[in-house]
């Protein structure tokens, strides 16, 4: 697994790098924090671990830059005790968030879960789905309707795929959380809400925000 670790605390970077490499992860860091994207584009990681507090520009800035050209999974690290940091990271398209200090074995479990759901989930499924008047391209994480195309994060696409495959049926929140993170202990209920809200916001760009209905106390439903 190719991991880009964007962490300016060299002691923590070296500790994490050593631990992750024991699990056969290939870990690369950033030398110049003014040019994070150059390392990102050259290394082409499968997962990015991104610290919030960085020199020059913060992690939120670099997350925006990465999302402009890639849906690579991003896991944020932060030493700040601020719930809004977690909300902001999800809004920007991050896949997970951990507050420092943390247990390394929990980080590894999260990375493995992210890898499974992003790179192994539904590999035998057909790669396009027809939904209402739109075409959902699972391989490109995109939705096309008329002359408009929107792009989703990996997390948003997995949520949408599950809803479409069960269209006109309620998919419970617990079912979605289990599929996304493999273990409910690794994600808050609020994280799922943020991802669904972000998905709806993107669907509104192609006039489909009402295509997903919230069933209060139960889950979500994608209309035919």
From Swiss-Prot:
Residues 2-115 form the Response regulatory domain. GO terms for molecular function: phosphorelay response regulator activity; transcription cis-regulatory region binding. It is found in: Cytoplasm. The keyword tRNA-binding does not apply. GO terms for cellular component: cytosol; protein-DNA complex. Phosphorylated by GraS. Keywords: Activator, Antibiotic resistance, Cytoplasm, DNA-binding, Phosphoprotein, Repressor, Transcription, Transcription regulation, Two-component regulatory system, Virulence. Pfam families: Response_reg (PF00072), Trans_reg_C (PF00486). SUPFAM superfamilies: C-terminal effector domain of the bipartite response regulators, CheY-like. The modification 4-aspartylphosphate is found at residue 51. One of its GO terms (biological process) is response to antibiotic. InterPro entries: CheY-like_superfamily, OmpR/PhoB-type_DNA-bd, Sig_transdc_resp-reg_C-effctor, Sig_transdc_resp-reg_receiver, WalR-like, WH-like_DNA-bd_sf. Its main location: cytoplasm. Residues 126-224 bind DNA. PANTHER family: REGULATOR OF RPOS, SENSORY TRANSDUCTION PROTEIN BCER. Member of the two-component regulatory system GraR/GraS involved in resistance against cationic antimicrobial peptides (CAMPs). This is Response regulator protein GraR.
């Amino acid at each position: 697994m190719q991991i880009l670790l964007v962490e300016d605390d060299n002691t923590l970077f070296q500790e994490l790098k050593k631990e992750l490499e024991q699990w056969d992860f290939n870990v690369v860091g950033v030398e110049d924090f003014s040019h994070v994207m150059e390392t990102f584009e050259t290394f082409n990681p499968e997962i990015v671990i991104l610290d919030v507090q960085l020199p020059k520009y913060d992690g939120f800035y670099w997350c925006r830059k990465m999302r402009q050209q890639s849906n690579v999974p991003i896991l944020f690290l932060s030493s700040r005790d601020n719930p809004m940091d977690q909300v902001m990271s999800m809004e920007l398209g991050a896949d997970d968030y951990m507050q420092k200090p943390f247990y390394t074995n929990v980080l590894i479990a999260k990375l493995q879960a992210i890898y499974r759901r992003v790179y192994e989930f539904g590999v035998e499924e057909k790669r396009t789905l027809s939904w209402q008047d739109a075409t959902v391209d699972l391989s490109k994480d995109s939705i096309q309707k008329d002359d408009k195309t929107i792009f989703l994060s990996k997390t948003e696409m997995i949520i949408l795929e599950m809803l479409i495959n069960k269209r006109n049926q309620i998919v419970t929140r617990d079912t979605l959380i289990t599929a996304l993170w493999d273990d409910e202990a690794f994600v808050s209920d609020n994280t799922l809400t943020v991802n669904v809200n972000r998905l709806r916001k993107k669907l509104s760009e192609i006039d489909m925000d009402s295509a997903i209905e919230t069933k209060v106390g139960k889950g979500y439903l994608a209309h035919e």
